[in-house]
Amino acid sequence: MTLKIFIERPVLSTVISVILVILGILGLIAMPITQYPEIAPPTVQVSASYPGANADVVLNSVIVPLEEQINGVENMTYMTSTAGNDGSASITVFFKQGTNPDLDAVNVQNRVSRATPLLPADVTRSGVVTSKRQSSMVMVFSINSSNKSFDGTFLQNYANINVIPMLKRVNGVGDVQAFGTQDYSMRIWLRPDAMASYGLVPDDITNALAEQNIEAAPGKIGENSNQSFQFVLKYKGRLKLPVEYENIIIKADSTGQLLRLKDVARVELGSLDYSVTMSTDNKPSIVMGVFQAAGTNAHAMIKECDSVIATAARSFPPGVSMNMIFTANQFLDISIHKVVETLIEAFILVSIVVFVFLQDLRSTLIPAIAVPVAIVGTFFFLNLFGFTINLLTLFALVLAIGIVVDDAIVVVEAVHAKLDQHAPTATEATLTAMNEISGAVISITLVMAAVFVPVTFITGSVGVFYKQFGLTLAVAILISAVNALTLSPALCALLLRPHHENALRQKGFLQRFYSAFNAAFGATTKKYKRSIQFLARRRWIAGLAVLVFIGLFAFLLKVTPAGFVPNEDQSFIMADVSLPPASSLERTTKIADQVMTIARQQPEMNSVVRVAGSGILSGGAGGSYGSLFMNLKDWDLRKGEEHSLTAVINKLFGATAGIKGAKIFFIAPPTLEGFGNTSGF
């Protein structure tokens, strides 16, 4: 018999288990850590800018031509688009689950290139950017200034030079987006009265700028000649100072008098756009969001981004600081830690239960060794399947502990039964027992696999959940069966002793505990038998109980709220402020500041960031939109249901109900990264 080899050669069984453990540890080290499996469909974003255009113009002249060409790209499911009154255009293309995001981005870029000739010249000049990224932010942080000499424009440009380029180089970062475009720009404010008196139109100013503010290649002199020297000519290039722009010549008359730009306009160094204002706890700031590229390791990416930001913060100017508003790792780390704790607790509880019922330390040791081998070995196959360490796979392993221990217990109990029948040695008892139960162990394993394997064929985003959960359990059960046929019999032959050797024992605490437990368990068993006999004589009671439970199940199924995944307290709240159309930025800022003041008064609040000019739910930019980002205190400081995220959101709704002239919504970030910008919808 094949199993005899493993029983008589325990080293072989041990080597098999050690190999499984080593492979499992290697797989565990190599596997990425995520909160949930990668189920969000790959997305590709196309963004463009049409300076000076409103939302209608952007929609008709930019978005429509792009959508017409992008529509129908390979593996596309649908797309969404937004147009802002600041001239911004954004199209997000969603693809089928499991497609290659790199190939999707290439296909979209090819379609965008077809639409480029149809776009306005100003749009093509500023560029149409195609990037692969998820729709939700995995990190939000702000750079603040307590120094009055550093305003938002300075912070934006400092970040553009010293922070954003470093973050974009991090592996897994799809995009780093700053709210608003406060890049340093030369602002030319035309004076209509002066323009009219000289008979000028804005195109005259634009043409003069295009002719005189250029990068030129003047060439060389003295090349290929009989001169002794040759020189490369240098041109000063684009203008940099306001006074240089002021002296741009607009036109000249026949007498030689020159009309300069300063005669018809005011020139100053300012911001490219004034449609967005930001503040953190009433201090000037800029807010940036980090987006994940599809198919990357979010946990490792966020850790590297944290390191990059910490390095950059060490060289910030005096009075400038960084404030981390939200990071997906904060909730992920504590979630994984709690599940690992549960995993360890489950193993300890199972070991205690096994010890209480088997009432023998040697017998308890066998399942206690077999369970870790099955659990750790599972990680090798999970890594082979391309899975991640996430809440689903860890939860499956928690359940697997209670399942895989059964195989080892079956083997131990079977060997004990043979020892009770006066088998001379543990080896002979193990051989006899395995001859009888090996078929049962294999059949039980196949039945359990038949339960979990079929659900892995479900497709779509939901199918990814079932696949990782089902295969994790199936693999753990299969490894447990291998242990039950190799390691557990070998350990039984080595550790167990014939019962007559242990017949006489000194009465101690454990023996008294065993006697009391067995007596109580025996009494419970007798009561259970009597209840079964009672129900056997009155079958209608059992039938009625079944019907009641079915009815209760149907009722609970109907009244229990349904959802894809439960909402989680991630210590982060977002607020969307929406005013009537055509509302000014100043009006939006005042209302957003009111909301920020109310939010800061909440005892659970850590910091609040206000962004006026950009909305969350609308996804667009404009003077009538605003948003807030609120970072709550750690969970240890918010114990109790009254301090939970849901409770804080409800309190904020109540506290801001008196603010008139605006719609204010408080929302939590999405539980699943890449599935929208918010949760609860």
Role assignments for model-derived ranges:
Residues 11, 19-57, 113-123, 387, ...:
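Transmembrane helices with small-residue packing motifs
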Residues 14, 21, 26, 30, ...:
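Surface-exposed amphipathic alpha-helical segments in non-transmembrane regions
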